[in-house]
Amino acid sequence: MKKLALLAFTLLSAWNMDAKTITGPVDYVSPLVGTQSKHALSTGNTYPAIALPWGMNFWVPQTGKMGDGWTYTYDADKIRGFKQTHQPSPWINDYGQFAIMPITGKVVFDQDQRASWFSHKAETATPYYYKVYLADHDVVTEIAPTERAAAFRFTFPDNDSYVVVDAFDNGSFVKVIPSENKIIGYTTKNSGGVPENFKNYFVLQFDKPFTYTAAVANGNIDTNKLEAKDKHAGAVIGFKTNKGEQVNVRVASSFISPEQAELNLKELGSGNVDQIAAKGRKVWNDVLGRIEVEDDDIDHLRTFYSCLYRSVLFPRSFYEI
């Protein structure tokens, strides 16, 4: 009986209970359903995949520690970063992952030190758009994905503001290119079953010049270097921002080469977060709308379309443009 009550609470708490107009099947979807899970007890073992149907890459707010299969749990209260993920389940774990995290004030890289408190009341999660307020840094993060890329928008306070790029700890490389407002690199992080030469190459294109740069090797932040190649590489770049100032970042990756990652970046076109989210919403409505369900109980519709959303995340596209 206790387990049934817990399951009911999990499902109810994961729905967005605010009244809203349903204009398409994607409005029934809650990516948070099934996320109140842990190693000892599963209520779904899901994570909120911010993605397009069958996309090559997904994005997820990361509450779990680096390498933890339970990358997002509903009862967590801190976000460590926003991770590109390819994870099918917590038991299989992830591969080719790296993370981005906006911070303010003191420069930090460590995943615990950079983590920020958040509330579900200040979180919007849909398949095509994610938004959250990071209270400790006073930063709003927004994400809109395409199949191989994503647009980020950070709204910063009046402060010294930074973006951390963490390529994780299985052998990685990160390079800051200030003249191009760009960061490139690769991660080899995986959980097995990959080729010997496996790499996920990534590129981040910013719309604002850097006023601070540092390379990070195994936790050591070095402002005299622009690149790091080590077991655990990363970078921190920064800006002096005014209250409400927005910094846009366009991110793409490739399993083929750095040059291909740059090509995949073109998938975003010239659209901003709002425009890319609108296109993603249409894609989701087109796919989910292939099956029309009628029911007088809105919770049944929410359950059906939330499950259908999960069904069309895989198999993922494994080809590049």
Stretches with model-predicted labels:
Residues 1-21:
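Bacterial Sec-dependent N-terminal signal peptides
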Residues 20-321:
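Accessory carbohydrate-recognition regions in carbohydrate-active enzymes
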